Amino acid sequence: MNLLTLQQMKERGEKIAVLTSYDASFAALSDKAGVDVLLVGDSLGMTMQGHANTLAVSLRDMEYHTRCVANGTQHAFIVTDMPFGSFQKTPEQAFENAVLLMAAGAQMVKVEGGAIMLETVRFLVERGIPVCGHLGLTPQSVHQFGGYRVQARDEAAARQLLDDAKALAAAGAGMLVLEMVPAALAAAVSQAVHIPVIGIGAGKYCDGQVLVLQDMLGIYAGKSPRFVRNFMQGAGSIEQAICDYVAAVKAQTFPGIEHTFE
């Protein structure tokens, strides 16, 4: 799997199945089950380290887990989150840190933010580092948002998000994640940009879907997010649960209306 293949999948309407991964064993299972993209997410701060958010995750953490995932992967495309504080200062800072993640096995790095990140995205892409953007709910800004809330529900915010998506694509971003935005807006973004758009809590009309591995396996304390489906129920094994997730994404039976925000 590579960026060109993912682009071709969008063009022919084949949905892209993305799942987070943090270690070699689960990466190998996901790879075998047909997951197209493995996201080494800074969500590991919550799922693996027990923090309340992603802000404490370090660059060294992301390097380590990227290396683990790469060691267990043969086919899937590997995207690694750039953690909080590792890319916001200057494009040069972002490049130096992205190089470390690429050396650890990432094939693309993901950065959160809209128009403010355009110079950095351009800088990285011009120097050979593929970049995935992330709009909507950007977890590294959780305190600014006042919690994990649906974004871009009013007309002005929706217009800004659409403009940001177009600008990121024009700056050279090769993929885009949309998190917790209304389904109609996500559909409009997917149609407006030429790059694959991956949704999480963004409805079924994105070019692909991503979930946190632990969430889709039902491993969470308290109430699960609305956009999550527990694929472990009735699956019998973790591998089968992942296979069922991939199949549901490809068949567009996940996400359903019950997982979607309007």
Curated annotation (Swiss-Prot):
Pfam families: Pantoate_transf (PF02548). Mg(2+) binds at D42, D81, E112. 3-methyl-2-oxobutanoate binds at D42, S43, D81, K110. Its cofactor is Mg(2+). It is found in: Cytoplasm. Its main location: cytoplasm. One of its GO terms (biological process) is pantothenate biosynthetic process. It is an enzyme of class 2 (transferase). Its EC number is 2.1.2.11. Pathway: Cofactor biosynthesis; (R)-pantothenate biosynthesis; (R)-pantoate from 3-methyl-2-oxobutanoate: step 1/2. InterPro entries: Pantoate_hydroxy_MeTrfase (IPR003700), Pyrv/PenolPyrv_kinase-like_dom (IPR015813), Pyrv_kinase-like_dom_sf (IPR040442). The active site is at E179 (proton acceptor). GO terms for molecular function: 3-methyl-2-oxobutanoate hydroxymethyltransferase activity; magnesium ion binding. Binds 1 Mg(2+) ion per subunit. It catalyses: 3-methyl-2-oxobutanoate + (6R)-5,10-methylene-5,6,7,8-tetrahydrofolate + H2O = 2-dehydropantoate + (6S)-5,6,7,8-tetrahydrofolate. One of its GO terms (cellular component) is cytoplasm. Keywords: Cytoplasm, Magnesium, Metal-binding, Pantothenate biosynthesis, Transferase. Catalyzes the reversible reaction in which hydroxymethyl group from 5,10-methylenetetrahydrofolate is transferred onto alpha-ketoisovalerate to form ketopantoate. Homodecamer; pentamer of dimers. Belongs to the PanB family. This is 3-methyl-2-oxobutanoate hydroxymethyltransferase. It comes from Methylobacillus flagellatus (strain ATCC 51484 / DSM 6875 / VKM B-1610 / KT). The lineage of its organism: Bacteria, Pseudomonadati, Pseudomonadota, Betaproteobacteria, Nitrosomonadales. The gene is panB.
